[in-house]
Amino acid sequence: MLVTPLLLVTLLCALCSAALYDSSSYVYYYQSAFRPPDGWHLHGGAYAVVNISSESNNAGSSSGCTVGTIHGGRVVNASSIAMTAPSSGMAWSSSQFCTAYCNFSDTTVFVTHCYKHGGCPITGMLQQHSIRVSAMKNGQLFYNLTVSVAKYPTFKSFQCVNNLTSVYLNGDLVYTSNETTDVTSAGVYFKAVGPITYKVMREVRALAYFVNGTAQDVILCDGSPRGLLACQYNTGNFSDGFYPFTNSSLVKQKFIVYRENSVNTTFTLHNFTFHNETGANPNPSGVQNIQTYQTQTAQSGYYNFNFSFLSSFVYKESNFMYGSYHPSCSFRLETINNGLWFNSLSVSIAYGPLQGGCKQSVFSGRATCCYAYSYGGPLLCKGVYSGELDHNFECGLLVYVTKSGGSRIQTATEPPVITQHNYNNITLNTCVDYNIYGRIGQGFITNVTDSAVSYNYLADAGLAILDTSGSIDIFVVQSEYGLNYYKVNPCEDVNQQFVVSGGKLVGILTSRNETGSQLLENQFYIKITNGTRRFRRSITESVENCPYVSYGKFCIKPDGSISTIVPKYLEQFVAPLLNVTENVLIPNSFNLTVTDEYIQTRMDKVQINCLQYICGNSLECRNLFQQYGPVCDNMLSVVNSVGQKEDMELLNFYSSTKPAGFNTPVLSNVSTGEFNISLFLTTPSSPRRRSFIEDLLFTSVESVGLPTDDAYKNCTAGPLGFLKDLVCAREYNGLLVLPPIITAEMQTLYTSSLVASMAFGGITAAGAIPFATQLQARINHLGITQSLLLKNQEKIAASFNKAIGHMQEGFRSTSLALQQIQDVVNKQSAILTETMASLNKNFGAISSVIQEIYLQLDAIQANAQVDRLITGRLSSLSVLASAKQAEYIRVSQQRELATQKINECVKSQSTRYSFCGNGRHVLTIPQNAPNGIVFIHFTYTPESFVNVTAIVGFCVKPNNASQYAIVPVNGRGIFIQVNDSYYITARDMYMPRHITAGDIVTLTSCQANYVSVNKTVITTFVENDDFDFDDELSKWWIETKYELPDFDQFNYTIPVLNITYDIDKIEEVIKGLNDSLIDLETLSILKTYIKWPWYVWLAIAFATIIFILILGWVFFMTGCCGCCCGCFGIIPLMSKCGKKSSYYTTFDNDVVTEQYRPKKSV
């Protein structure tokens, strides 16, 4: 049985009507009437605790609570709630407990007690020492249960469950119905002896273990590892092993990856333009008779109101009854477009009296605000007040604005632009709903930047790599520190398995590399501690055998730790299994080989008019041919069916081999089609060179050097390195050499040495030895360098000529191979040509021309002759049809082979030896060819082999047990013997290693089962044993009249494609090109830096001083001292800047005057 988790059972009640299984983390309810058999059972009724709270007293400061009433409580909206008192319980008294209730939507169930006459408003007075459980709906009681206090001496718990609205008092079921409704509110009304603990719960499925009808253990199906395992297998008892599982848990997290960091949204700006109504008439008397024009009403959005025509009008301020009137509008029409907000807005213009026109329009409700403008209008507008209706006033322009406050409408002068900033918060290592660059899906996101950044994936502004289904496989996000790569994995791993060791759930095996996992063989292991995942733990010590569960060479212990299984050497084996040992060759080094393979995938179709082919235009022949029946139709149906099958299979072939999408990478302007070879490309390293300062201050001289020159340069490095010139000389092939370049310091040194040696004759002659030695060493350097240059020149010329010759051979051989491919197409036409040539054969007739036969002979004789032509030509067509059928079968088989080659060689890497080329497959590139495909296979083939002793297996004879045999696991390799030790190695590559438990399969016996195949003879179908086939055939042949055409004159050839010789020729050319590699003698470039002479430095100093003086003089003469006074520090300039500067100003009267102003400090 799996280990029971912490915080398990704290209370277990199995009473008369119901039972509950209660813990601090969940409560399990089940009907006592339902007694399942012993064992594990999957049921509903489990409720996991989601919230726990407590309450000490809700009766306030009064002496007690009021019995018989419902008071207090809290809103829960949950599947279940449990309200429990302390273990001692509460007395049925107003000083301790009064009422507990649960509200199921419109139904309320409660328990209370009330012994006071007239003081029990809900239940009425009860008998002494009794309690009441009631249910009430819409204020009316419809269920009453009176129970003696003797059964429930104290109140301990009141629990309500949504399943059939079940209510439990002290663990007993006291109310239920046929409805299932969540609990909306609940509470306990009490005074003392608290606290009351409230447990709010949600419903989950559970697996319960029953003994004699009572739940002894419960496992929640809550998504935990233990719950997933137990509820999927309907048991809590597991033996050691691996258990596949699925986890379809609810995805709660979402995230979005935006393509842009920010998005600008430009809104539409609606423009309303108003103009002057030139044809408007003066208004009649009364404000209601003022006519409006150009009414514009804004709906929602952004608006611009254009009142440009008002520039010729004069705004009239509000002056009691005269002019404008807009106290509710804090803006003018000139500022209405300054980003004002409205809930509704309507604008119109009118023409009315300036005297009272605006004010009365606002008072009468025609507008919220009114703006008056004068344009010098006539005195023709009637008044709007009761005493002025017949008076004439000056007409003016009135602008009505009707508005209400809000945010639906905003005014603007330009289309508004709102910038939305997007932030990518990517959720890792959990199943999420994602929206990545507009593609929506669900997946498990992992960060693969460390493994992908070095290969420059998506370097050319790409966003994502899609898989064959079109879903995102890898995507990239630009961050502050560069590109981050993420991989989208499926949420559900079909290979995930729980690991049970020692009866305990200890870990998970999955194919997904999650954080904290460790690699075991081809899977990743995640340890589980206390029901949760934990981080990676290193593999502990090795063991000789594993009494628990093992995976390959790893042993998984009950504590979740991992040990490596290293079995002891088999000291008890008597002999190799079956006493069979043999020497085998196993390759240990390989060469890259390129193999060309041509496969024909289509055939040329043919259509022949059978009747025209047989008889031509002869009517006599056509009449005679009618006696042959539908032979032409049958033959043509065969040819046509071959063509139709060819078309159908060809379409299926190309549709099945065409990839779902073309991901063409661009790698430095190199197109590789569908094949991504970015993993093979490396980033070129930046060349090393001298610093910019050295190249600027020194003149460099380059000369051809020897390999010893680098050591010379390192030896002479430093400020006084020239003094060690002769000391740093090197030898090359026994000769002393020095670089031929001599600097000025060296020249001075050696010249002084030579002059000093000649000063006193023989006494100082030895001083010339350094001069002579260095001169001879430099002459040796020049001679050796010239000889190496000549040798390298000869090698380059010879290798180049050899390479040109091999390239010519290669082009010639490739041309021949392609010519043979083209011959396949040409020979298809040759078959048709041969068929047409059969028209010239007479097939035993007097002529091959039907018209000529009918001219020379009478009708009966001519028909007999033409009958021979018809029979011969039908035979020729039959051969053509048979040839096409045979060709279709062969091409169909070739297409199947091509499909396998594309799927296994092009789209993947084949594991079959020599199926994709010769040797182990690496890469295949397909190319189009006439009527087929050419595959270019890149493989590696063995170059050298190791001769080892191979062993089938071992026969082991333990001391106190029966013998058994061990053999290698299929696919792991073979057992070999090396220096009296035994190892296992792969069959196709020599890699010997120690034998582990995961490499062997145990057989029950050391004996082999031999199977022999008996020879079985099928009896003849003729009962007579004296049946002679030759005799029967001769009888049939003699009795049959026959006359066959001369088939020797008919020649039919099936073309066979053979480019083996040309491929071998290409391989010889490749070897020749490899042999033409040039191995040059190593030369080096000697770069010597020579310092400039002293007079150059003196000229640079003079030029710098002159430049500074000229710059100071310019500042001095122009008066632009500004910031220069404190920068240059020139004394005359400082004294000049200390005075007041002057400037000249030219006035309109062309009088030039001089003005002075104080100096401004900077």
From Swiss-Prot:
Sites carrying a glycan are: 51, 77, 103, 144, 163, 178, 212, 237, 247, 264, 271, 276, 306, 425, 447, 513, 530, 579, 591, 669, 676, 714, 947, 960, 979, 1014, 1051, 1058, 1074
- PROSITE patterns, per the entry: COV_S2_HR1 (PS51923), COV_S2_HR2 (PS51924)
Extract the Pfam families matched here: CoV_S1_C (PF19209), CoV_S2 (PF01601), CoV_S2_C (PF19214)
User: Coiled-coil segments, which residues?
Assistant: 822-866, 1055-1083
Residue ranges annotated as transmembrane are 1096-1116
InterPro entries named among the record's database cross-references:
CoV_S1_C, S2_sf_CoV, Spike_S2_CoV, Spike_S2_CoV_C, Spike_S2_CoV_HR1, Spike_S2_CoV_HR2
**Entry's Gene Ontology BP terms:** endocytosis involved in viral entry into host cell; fusion of virus membrane with host endosome membrane; fusion of virus membrane with host plasma membrane; receptor-mediated virion attachment to host cell
Q: Which GO terms describe its cellular component?
A: host cell endoplasmic reticulum-Golgi intermediate compartment membrane; membrane; viral envelope; virion membrane
Q: Where is the signal peptide?
A: 1-18
The segments annotated as topological domain Extracellular are 19-1095
Q: Which residues lie on this side of the membrane: Cytoplasmic?
A: 1117-1162
Q: Where is this region: Heptad repeat 2 (HR2)?
A: 1024-1105
Q: The motif Di-lysine motif: which residues?
A: 1159-1162
Q: Which residue positions does UniProt flag as site: Cleavage?
A: R537, S538, R690, S691
> Annotated region Heptad repeat 1 (HR1): where?
769-874
Subunit structure of this chain's protein: Homotrimer; each monomer consists of a S1 and a S2 subunit. The resulting peplomers protrude from the virus surface as spikes.
Q: What is known of its domains?
A: The di-lysine motif confers endoplasmic reticulum localization for type I membrane proteins.
Q: What is this protein called?
A: Spike glycoprotein
